[in-house]
Amino acid sequence: MSGCLQILTVLLCCRFWALVFSQDQSCCVHHAADIPRCRDACEQLASIRSESRLRHLLHRLPSYCPETLSELWICINNSLPGASRKSDGWVGLGCCELAISAECRRDCKQASSKNDISKVCKKDTENPLYSCITKNEMGSVCCSYAGRHTTCREYCQAIFRTDSSPTVSQISAVKEYCQSVSPPLILCVENYTRLHPTHRPIDSLHCCDRAEEAHCQLACKRILRTLSTEQEIMDGLISECGSQPLPQDPLWQCFLGSAHPPANTDPESPPIAKMDSAKLHCCFKANTSICRNMCVEISTSWGTQSWQEFDQHCEYNPVEMDLITCLADVREPCQLGCKELSYCTNFNNRPTELFRSCNVQSDQGALNDFKLWSNGSIRMPLMNIPVLDIRRCRPEMWKTVACALQIKPCYSRSRGSVICRSDCVEILRQCGDRRRFAEAQTPERICDLLSPTDDPERCIPLNRYLTASELESSVEEVIHPCNPNPCPSSHLCHVNRKGCHVGHDCLPYYCVPGCKLGEASEFLVPADARLQVPVHSAQPGCYEVCVCGQSGRLENCAEMPCFDTSKSCQIAGQRRSHGSSFRVDCNPCSCFAGDAVCSSRQCVRSDSSEEDRRLFTGLPCGCADHFVPVCAGNGRTYPSACVARCVGFTDSQFVFGSCRSFDPCSPNPCQRNQRCVPRRQVCLTDLSEFPCPQYECVSRPSSCDQKLLDPVCDTDNMEHANLCVLNLRGKTLAYSGHCQDACRRPREVCAHNGESYSTVCEAFSERVAVDYQGRCHAVGLESEFGSDSGCNAVPCPPLASDACQPVTPPGACCPVCAGMLRILWNKAQMNIFAKLNRDQPVSLHDILKILRLHVSVPQCDIFGYLSINSEIIILIAPVDQQPTPLQIEACSKEAEKIDSLINSGSPTLVSHVPLSAFLSSELQLSSVRSSSCVSISVCVLLLLCSLILTLTSDL
């Protein structure tokens, strides 16, 4: 533990390292010589001058240099002036040993305030720690009134120094020595003692009934009646009951709960009702009225009712899977990657799998669960399951169960955390103590209630985690900069895709301030985001749109028109409820408040003749696959006038030619003192209500923030820190991002949206992927049944990797290695969002900008376009020119994650405007052939060499 403490001290004080340790490599030479990887990493750190890069690599140093190298860490620690300069006066320092998890304990000892531990020390699992800190904080306030009167201060501090409630003699002593010194101190102490009345041991007698063994229950009651101090009582219970105080043990849970200060029941000052809009989103997914009503009550009036009752009635109710999964998304969103667990080691090194809770706390929780179950009983909200000694009966299987329920792997169609039924039945048949089973209780009946499915996409298959991952290498083909979250508790972590200032190093992530989705919510959204949240009345179908303000609160809320969720859709004689998805022929559809919203794909009828199938183009209205492009008023290029008319545009709403072939600033529509700048966009709202301008008028700025990094490249291939600087210098934008040598000269490409771009950089800048080299000249495939004659003359580029089975996007000619989503959306909702945003149209760029934040792996990026059938097509593809199979798999998993969030209506995604208008999604993935690399060790070796060369060139 001391080694970990030294490591943490180093990480907290990395800015001092640059001043001192960089001049002295003796720590590396003398104490890391036997571990080459550690010595190399240590020496690299010693030579770095960039503080940002130093900080990033320092955070990774423990993965190269284990904490067992205590002399190394002591040496490093001693090289840091100020390493021990934490605030010794922090009142919580004396509480740190009460922390349950080792990581929380370490952070607590290095903290300067409660804010420093909020990310690692969770209030729901570290109750004793936070109760102690709260008590010490109150003591610090009260005793500060003593001023320089040391005797008064000492008697005051004695009241707050122990876990016990203050005794009568302690209170009398404070009054005697402090009454004349400071009446405010007396008043403060009286307020504290009124909130924390003296707790008698016999007040906790009811907790004894929570013990599982009869002899423990009797001993508990005897101890509480005969012993007085809390230490004596705790020692006696540990001795008599034979178990340590684990937080999952119902007996100890009860004692901890009894120690908490009672709620303020003063009728004159009722608690302020706090709202959790994120959880309230989920309440409308409940299938039973009792769970819906309980969910609404605890989401709109936080603190008026415990979640325990809700958990008992709803948490393990199979019919409430949608509700429970939604709440799990809000509490613990699924994230890619898992590593650095010390107990659940088989879950490590899984960079392309999704987990809800891969962290030190859950790792410790799994260990505690296993210890608790070793007592012979598994306590669940609905039942107790008697088991044999699991330390002898399938211990590895039980360890995997404990880890799976704590680490919580996520799967595509259900992100709930239940093990598969067959695993449940197997382990209870072998290790269930049938002599103690309740009447009519069998392994099958237990598992029908707790693990009702064997669908591998809806449950956790234990065999996957009974052995270690095959990816044992630490080489970072796929990294997760934001997992675990490195940012403060009030900030969100975003992947850094902007890069660094020229000549500087930077971290692979950046932190942005956020807002909670309600006073009681833990769910954060980024500043300036527009959110759709339920109204306070919690009436189904009634929402308001708010903005996350700079104050950290939701502001400027405007109510949306309510929609009737009780209305159903009548389709082909069948009734479809609001929010349900279905198909009509080949078209995906969704019912929204009584209206069926469907895509407009062209379908081949089952009774079509061979001639009809031969002539079928897959284009709207059976249009010919001739490429004579027209530019519609929504900013989208369509392959022909026939297609544009068929999808709803009049002849006055389109012109012949592709949209990028026109200069929106000619003639100049701006005022004399303004400059016209092209700003091409594809709008998703009605043109009759919300015009879709392709330019903006900007005034030449007088000055710009050079430190604000959002790089852009001009037509002279000169890079500027941001668009403001480019406009200040009077340059013309070529594309966003750093200038690339590969795009220095024009080389036309055709993108998936049917537009031709001068360079691939221009296409990527508009977040659209490339179909083939050269100017667009063909109508791509719109249907698997359609003719591909238009693509016959197109030379497709080679696939990025021979290892992938590619997908072909709608309207494209060439396949790509990517995960693809085809999203159905509600135009009426888009129009409402535009109306509430000062009549600003909603664009495809707005969609892509938000979705991009949900892609957590830097090796993958998002691209998208509007198909001619008005579906939003999203591609999540590797950014490397020659991606590894693991990177392709990671991109597919990112697409799978977003697809699942859309189809489940998870508030983690659809609370963001305009993503709230999403109805459903169809997923296609690029599968990966495992034979792409002859040997994992060879692949790892090649990648390691590449990494070393890259690091060497950077340094």
Swiss-Prot record:
What are the subcellular locations of this protein?
Answer: Cell membrane
In what way does this protein cross or attach to the membrane? Lipid-anchor; GPI-anchor
Q: Which PANTHER family has this protein been placed in?
A: REVERSION-INDUCING CYSTEINE-RICH PROTEIN WITH KAZAL MOTIFS, SERINE PROTEASE INHIBITOR
- Write the protein's name: Reversion-inducing cysteine-rich protein with Kazal motifs
- Disulfide bond positions: 621-646, 623-642, 631-659, 704-724, 713-739
Q: Signal peptide location in the record?
A: 1-22
Which cellular component terms (GO) are annotated to the entry? plasma membrane; side of membrane; Wnt signalosome
Describe the effect of residue 254 to Y.
In no food for thought mutant (nft); lethality caused by the absence of most of the intracerebral central arteries. Defects are caused by impaired Wnt signaling
Sugar-bearing residue positions: 77, 191, 287, 375
Locate the region 5 X Knot repeats: 28-326
Q: Where is the lipid attached (GPI-anchor amidated serine)?
A: 931
Q: Which domain of life is it from?
A: Eukaryota
So which tissues is this one expressed in?
Answer: Expressed in the cerebral endothelium.
The species is Danio rerio (Zebrafish)
